[in-house]
């Protein structure tokens, strides 16, 4: 049987008619999503009249026998509409070359749909992962036509695609609706009405859980999350009450490191180390009773993208609320994670780390020479100032990359999506402002990358600041103010990316 084509139908809502396409091969939810984009009535509020009753989310649209030109009646209150832009939205394909060049290095925001800053900030940081964009672009499932997480991943792909077409703010209507359908906690209402504020870390983990089904671009049998966002933790548990009991060894995956914050925590790495050594109580087969154990964790695999959660919220029984820890905790823009790994991994990454540092130092020195020679003809600069021409610099970098690759152990080279050096650079931050977890305001900060085709561009010194639909550019040193110490915006989720040449 040939593939069904979409049918042009009409939807009537509040006396207005809308032209919409209906895909007979999709589910009812897909049609509701299309209605939502036209009428701004969220799918969960819609009552779509069909013969015999109301359209359900899981109804096969092919079974309702829709006809081209048929009119569907829709009942439901529209959500609050985003304010109209002060100037017409200009899409990238309509821009002249010069404007397009500037716009390609700019990113638009996301419209706050009512206490959704937690989601907007999370989505902006997730978007900074280029391998994720590539994997989503190759994903073929459709919203509504697939079940569960597959539909959420498809909605994420469509949202990022729409964001890539314009520099204006985009309302994440469909993705938010899908998230609330799959995870009802994000549909909770506040005491005063409307949707409640949620935890950005919980939103991050739920989205990553859905992305576990996303194929990687390296192979149809591989998955994006295990390759790029999952590490391996080696765990040793030792009974402290019996020297006769042998320690237990095991390994398990992790998707995020926890930075616990105590009265003595001053920096991120010390907080992570504290979380990796725990005291616990469990049954001892040797002693035949409950006994105390010490659990030590070390990282056996470092992923290319490593999120760190600053555990700033804890439950206070006396007031029955989550309370925020305001303590100042510094975090690095560049980070060597080798102090957290197993001895075996430390031995493998040590020569790679040393070689990368050596090459980056030499490149930095050459960049200084190039800067001094700026504005002079290439030939003159090369002779008089010692600066390489662009072509010479590119050739030198190719040589350096080959030398670097030669230092990587075969086991690391074959592990697509791992960090081979242990060196990371900060690329994204979700911050929280306020004293309570269920209140306050989330924002995100994403490193502004140089143009992809400018291989000789110096490292970025600017960051995007995303405050929902408001986007600005700030210098990198502004990040130092996000360490905490007050009720202003403080780092809550950090995303580190493996350094590359």
Predicted regions and their residues:
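UBL (ubiquitin/ubiquitin-like) substrate-recognition surfaces
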Residues: 2-501
């Amino acid at each position: 049987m040939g593939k069904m084509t979409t049918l042009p139908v009409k939807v009537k809502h509040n006396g207005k008619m809308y032209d919409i396409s209906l895909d007979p091969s999709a589910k009812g939810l897909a049609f509701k999503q299309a209605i939502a984009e036209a009428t701004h009535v969220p799918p969960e509020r819609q009552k779509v009249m069909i013969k015999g009753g109301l359209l359900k989310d899981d109804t096969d649209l092919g079974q309702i026998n829709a006809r081209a030109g048929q009119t569907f009646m829709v009942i439901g209150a529209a959500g609050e509409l985003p304010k109209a832009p002060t100037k017409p939205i200009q899409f990238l394909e309509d821009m002249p070359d010069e404007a397009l060049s500037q716009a390609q290095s700019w990113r638009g925001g996301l419209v706050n749909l009512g206490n959704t800053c937690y989601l907007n900030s999370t989505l902006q940081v997730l978007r900074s992962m280029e391998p994720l964009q590539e994997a989503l672009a190759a994903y073929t499932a459709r919203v509504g036509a697939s079940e569960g997480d597959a539909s959420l991943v498809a909605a994420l792909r469509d949202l990022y695609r729409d964001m890539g077409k314009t520099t204006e703010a985009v309302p994440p209507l469909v993705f938010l609706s899908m998230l609330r359908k799959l995870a009802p906690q994000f549909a909770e209402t506040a005491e005063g009405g409307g949707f409640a504020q949620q935890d950005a870390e919980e939103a991050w983990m739920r989205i990553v859980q859905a992305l576990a089904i996303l194929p990687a671009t390296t192979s149809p049998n591989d998955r994006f999350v295990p390759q790029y966002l999952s590490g391996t933790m080696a765990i040793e548990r030792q009974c402290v009450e019996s020297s006769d009991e042998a320690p237990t060894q095991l390994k398990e995956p992790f998707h995020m490191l926890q930075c616990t914050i105590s009265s003595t925590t001053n920096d991120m790495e010390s907080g992570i180390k504290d979380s990796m050594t725990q005291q616990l109580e469990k049954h001892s087969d040797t002693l035949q009773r409950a006994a105390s154990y010490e659990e030590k964790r070390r990282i056996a695999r470092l992923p290319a993208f490593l999120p760190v959660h600053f555990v700033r919220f804890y439950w206070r029984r006396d007031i029955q609320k989550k309370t925020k820890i305001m303590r100042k905790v510094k975090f690095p823009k560049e980070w060597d994670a080798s102090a957290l790994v197993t001895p075996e991994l430390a031995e493998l990454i040590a020569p790679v780390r040393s070689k990368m540092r050596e090459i980056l130092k030499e490149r930095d020195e050459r960049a200084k020479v190039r800067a001094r020679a700026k504005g002079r003809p290439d030939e003159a600069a090369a002779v008089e100032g010692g600066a390489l021409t662009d072509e010479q610099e590119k050739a030198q970098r190719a040589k350096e990359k080959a030398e670097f690759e030669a230092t990587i152990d075969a086991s690391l080279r074959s592990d697509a999506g791992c960090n081979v050096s242990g060196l990371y650079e900060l690329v994204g931050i979700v911050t929280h402002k306020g004293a309570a977890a269920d209140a306050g305001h989330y924002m995100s900060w994403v490193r502004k990358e140089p143009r992809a085709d400018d291989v000789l561009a110096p490292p970025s010194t600017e960051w995007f600041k995303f405050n929902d639909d408001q986007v600005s550019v700030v210098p990198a040193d502004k990040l130092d103010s996000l360490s905490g110490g007050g009720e202003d915006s403080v780092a809550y989720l950090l995303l580190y990316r493996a350094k590359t040449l």
